[in-house]
Amino acid sequence: DGCCIAKQCC
């Protein structure tokens, strides 16, 4: 749910 937005997976 928005992991790239939260910069946890990107």
From Swiss-Prot:
GO terms for cellular component: extracellular region. It comes from the Eukaryota. The keyword Nucleus does not apply. Expressed by the venom duct. GO terms for molecular function: toxin activity. Transmembrane segments: none annotated. Contains 2 disulfide bonds that can be either 'C1-C3, C2-C4' or 'C1-C4, C2-C3', since these disulfide connectivities have been observed for conotoxins with cysteine framework V (for examples, see AC P0DQQ7 and AC P81755). The keyword Transferase does not apply. Keywords: Disulfide bond, Secreted, Toxin. It is found in: Secreted. Belongs to the conotoxin T superfamily. The cysteine framework is V (CC-CC). This is Conotoxin ar5d. It comes from Conus araneosus (Cobweb cone).
